[in-house]
Each structure stands twice: as structure tokens, then as C-alpha cells.
Amino acid sequence: MADLTFKLYDLDDNEIKPKAVLSYELSRDADAACDGLRLNLLLDEAGAELYTVKAFYGKVCAFNGYVDTQRESINANGSTCFLYCRSSACLLVDSEAKPFTYNSPSVNALFEIGIGDGFRLCMDNVFSDIQYQVSKGTSKFGLINDFVFNVTGNRIRVNPKNEIVMLKSERVIKIDRDRILSVKREINRGNAVMGVDYKLNSSDDYLYHRVSRFMQKKRISATRMLNMSNVPDWQRETRLSSFVSNANAGYCCWELKLSGYADIDLADIIRTDLDGFDDYGDVVAVGIRHTCNASGEYTVIKAYSALDLEELSYVDE
């Protein structure tokens, strides 16, 4: 029996009870605004246009979203139905924010002006005393996410309670070794960056440098060049630090396959007694896939080691 249970609703918010759940795949990714759900099920009859889907792990809502695709095959035994759904963040991703330039904005003000009903902002107030420009084509999700990232270096996500929160966690998940079906580790040196050479004025040379002593110790020599002259002063430090950390984020990557449904969320810290598991620092979940099909039920976790890059800055004399 699957660990997740599902509730389906039509356009009139009437619950449609499936005859059976054949398979599901629930995916979360730190690089994606929306969680995704693929669901195959049997219905007594076809015809109802499904609108929303919720998934529960016990009494806890694990997914709250909207149907993007509904595909049915009808025969004498009823209807076989495939659903692809995105989490409620899709309402913000699919809607455009008003192009505007805000003076000394805060995330609270941007939320009140640009998001509207249906969501709650659940984070400490983030603010800046500089202008923030929202360009044409920016989504409502991007309105909040881009501002928070430029100020703090952190991204946001929308959880199943429709709460807008920071994509970070201090929760530690301990995984029993007996539950682990397989483990993979990758060291990705090809994309790693030792440092950045940058300039603050377009007429200057690349006199400023940010290097990672950690990557120097690993004998990584690759560097990148950035022109920071068009980057507002208040965004420069975040932009530099984020560039180096993002380039090296997947240096040590883990994939753990666990039996059953694992109650874990993005950015949770993973602990296990595998040899060498935390040699590069805390291991943080960046992707989660829960699957149930004819082969059984399992969870695959993609995780990165949170490196201490030991960053050092200097200027040419």
C-alpha cells in the first residue's frame, strides 16, 4: 500500500474519489519553482474535469497543486487516467508582475502589492534602501524571489500550505543505514571554479579578485571574468559570493535511494553513518523524488555537500 494518499477535486470543488492509484511520482527540485506530480489512477467513470490535487503523508499535506494535463483512456472497466500537476507556486509562476521601479522596497511591501490573496508570506522582512527594478516579463514568483536573492543570496519556495518561505532549513534528517537501497557519489571537477576576476568600472581592468582557498587546495585553477560595473552596489557582494558558490555547488554530489516514502524536504541536512559521507561538510538535499509503481515504493534524494570555500578577496596594486 502506498504511503501517500490523494484527494482530487473537480472545477466545482467536488471530491472525485479514484477507484485505485496505479502509480505516482512526486518531485521537488531546488532549481524549480514548482513541485511536480505524475499520477496514474483508475476512475469509475470519465468525464469530470479535474482541477486540484492534494497528496497526504498521514495527516500532513505533502503536495497541493493544480492539474496541468489530464489524459484518459476509457474501456469497459472504467477510466484509466494520467494527471500531471504542478504545485500551487504555478499560480505565481504563470502570472506576470507589473513592470515597475520600487524605491527602498521590502519583501513585505512587494508581497502586499504584487501577490494578492491565496498565499502567506512566512519569512523575516527583507528590505533594501536602493531601487529595485521589475522588468517586463518577470513573474509574480520572480518578483519576490529575485529581490530576496539579490539581498540575501537565498531563494524562496512555496510550501504545500501556500506559505512563501526561504529555501533554507536547519532541520536535520537522520537516515537509518538499513533503509538505504543504494548510494552514489560524484566529484565534479570539470565545472568547478577557483575564483573570479572582476572590475567595478567599465573603463578599468580586472583588478579585483575573489578566490576559494578550498578549490586551490583541490588543485582547481579555472577562473571566470565578470564585469560588475552595471551591478548596483547593494547587489555586488551577493552576486560575487553566489557566483562562486553556485559554480562549485555540485562539486561533491550524492544520490541516495531509500525504501518507502522518506519525510524529507528541500534544504534539509542529511545525516547517516556512511563512511566519508560528511567529509566535505554538511550534506543538503537539493532534489527529492518519491516514486510508487509496480516495482515498489522508494525515495531518491539528490544532495550536495555544503562546502566551506574559504573565500579570500584582494586587489591588484
Each model region followed by its residue ranges:
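Charged- and aromatic-enriched interaction segments used to assemble
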Residues: 79-188
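Assembly/oligomerization scaffold segments
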Residues: 1-97, 149-152, 157, 179-181, ...
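Generic preference for hydrophobic/aromatic residues in regular secondary structure cores
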Residues: 4-8, 52-58, 97, 102, ...
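Short, acidic/charged, Gly/Pro-enriched secondary-structure junctions
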Residues: 2-11, 40-72, 103-117, 259-282, ...
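Broad hydrophobic/π-residue packing in well-ordered secondary structure
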Residues: 37, 65, 101, 125, ...
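An acidic/polar, Gly/Ser/Thr-rich interaction patch typically located in mid-to-C-terminal regions
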Residues: 17-46, 183-317
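Residue-identity detector for glutamine
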Residues: 70, 131-133, 216, 235
